[in-house]
């Protein structure tokens, strides 16, 4: 119930945001956690899997109903236009030497019946109940799989948008710096202190900086489109991300270890659920050799007359009976035995898959831990280089403004700063993605 209320709240909040956007051109502001919650509430694959769980529950309840009394009523009205003829053997009627044709019954016959059955023991029904419960558990683990995959995709799409936002800011700064150098170069060229080739080189640098800005803008648009696709929101909506790369990386836990518990991974639990399902199927077929027993009863009242007189109580004749019915399997051509063998072999396959998954999960955990450690180490180095490049750029910018540093030397410093900036941003993104992959490998996402 709590999950339903949360889901309803998110949907209403999102619908209100989109309504406001359509009317007043407002934007949707999302933190990473809000984006994940919104995406989980919107995604069609998750909705379908939730419906699959409801279908499994409905099937389980349907099977349980087979153990409840089954009561039916019927009414049959019959008009015998020509009564059936029966032959009595010779001698049945005194003096008869040949078969004597006779007709029994009345032209009008109305039968009202109530029948009831109640299972006493039915191995198939109890087996189906266990199978339906195991299927529901498998569907629940599958829902967890969809949610974890969605969290991973949304998180990485969110990170990519943030990275491209920062790339745009850096590209804009590079364009501004290049424009400053071009303006000063044009002044020097006019004064005759700068040759045409050097000015053309500055102008080329400005053109390249503008191209990089356009590329960064296109990358941002593509990444935003990818995020909207993950969140299932209208492509025309405007999304503003409230988290930043620096804030997100400061909130990550870098204490990585290689310990792993395969049972925390949905892949392992899905295989375990499938193995349990196959084991239950084998038991179900094994128990189908047992007899099925049920009680039954019938209460009827019949109207017979030469005329149609349904309201004449003197022409109604009741009867009733009860009994016990048993179906005993004797020979089915070895069908049950072969089904049991098939499910036992599938169970062995499941066990092999679980062993392989356990090994693969441990390997993946170690690999993602190493990738996270490497990414974080590169991040620390890139951060130091970026801070150093910033300080050098500050000094050289002052020297350039004072006329003690050439534009070419300043350009070299700017290139170094650009590389340091790009490496720094990329290292942040790599740490965040590595953190997601590591948590997913450990089953903690």
Model-predicted segments: where are they?
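Sec/SRP-type N-terminal targeting helices
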Residues: 47-51, 64, 109, 120-147, ...
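Sec-dependent signal peptide cleavage junction
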Residues: 18-41, 45-53, 221, 236
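Heptad-repeat register of long alpha-helical coiled-coils used for dimerization/oligomerization
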Residues: 29, 33-36, 43, 119, ...
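A small-residue-enriched
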Residues: 40-120, 262-333, 363
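Periplasmic alpha-helical coiled-coil/stalk elements that build and connect Gram-negative outer-membrane
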Residues: 3, 30, 58, 149-262, ...
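Bacterial Sec-dependent N-terminal signal peptides
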Residues: 1-32, 43, 67, 425, ...
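Short segments within alpha-helical structural elements
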Residues: 211-233, 387-444
């Amino acid at each position: 119930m709590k999950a339903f209320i949360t889901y309803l709240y998110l949907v209403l909040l999102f619908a209100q945001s989109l309504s406001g956007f359509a009317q007043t051109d407002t934007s949707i502001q999302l933190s990473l956690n809000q984006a994940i919650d919104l995406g989980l509430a919107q995604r069609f694959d998750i909705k379908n899997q939730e419906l699959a769980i409801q279908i499994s529950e409905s099937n389980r309840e349907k099977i349980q109903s087979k153990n409840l009394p089954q009561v039916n009523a019927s009414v049959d009205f019959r008009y015998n236009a020509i009564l059936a003829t029966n032959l009595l053997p010779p001698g049945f009627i005194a003096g008869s030497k040949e078969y004597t044709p006779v007709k029994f019954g009345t032209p009008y016959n109305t039968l009202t019946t109530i029948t009831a059955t109640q299972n006493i023991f039915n191995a198939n029904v109890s087996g189906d109940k266990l199978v339906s419960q195991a299927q529901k558990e498998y569907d629940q683990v599958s829902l967890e799989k969809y949610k974890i995959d969605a969290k991973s995709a949304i998180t990485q799409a969110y990170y990519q948008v943030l990275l491209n936002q920062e790339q745009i800011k850096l590209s804009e700064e590079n364009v501004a710096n290049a424009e400053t150098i071009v303006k000063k170069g044009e002044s020097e060229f006019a004064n005759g202190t700068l040759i045409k080739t050097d000015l053309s080189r500055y102008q080329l640098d400005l053109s390249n900086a503008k191209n990089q800005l356009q590329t960064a803008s296109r990358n941002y648009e593509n990444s935003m489109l990818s995020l909207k696709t993950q969140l299932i929101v209208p492509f025309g909506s405007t999304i503003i991300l409230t988290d930043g790369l620096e804030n997100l990386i400061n909130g990550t836990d870098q204490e990585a270890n290689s310990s792993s518990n395969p049972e925390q991974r949905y892949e392992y639990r899905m295989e375990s659920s499938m193995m349990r399902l196959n084991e239950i199927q084998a038991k179900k077929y094994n128990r189908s050799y047992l007899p099925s027993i049920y009680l039954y009863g019938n209460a009827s009242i019949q109207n017979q007359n030469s005329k149609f007189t349904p309201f004449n109580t003197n022409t109604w004749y009741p009867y009733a009976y009860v009994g016990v019915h048993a179906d005993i399997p004797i020979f089915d051509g070895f069908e049950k035995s072969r089904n049991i063998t098939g499910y036992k072999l599938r169970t062995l396959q499941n066990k092999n898959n679980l062993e392989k998954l356990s090994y693969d999960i441990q390997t993946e955990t170690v690999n993602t831990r190493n990738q996270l450690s490497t990414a974080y180490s590169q991040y620390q180095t890139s951060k130091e280089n970026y801070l150093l490049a910033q300080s050098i750029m500050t000094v050289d910018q002052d020297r350039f403004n004072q006329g003690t540093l050439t534009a070419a030397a300043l350009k070299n410093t700017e290139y170094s700063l650009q590389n340091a900036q790009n490496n720094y941003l990329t290292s942040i993104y790599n740490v965040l993605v590595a953190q997601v992959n590591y948590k997913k490998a450990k089953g903690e996402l």
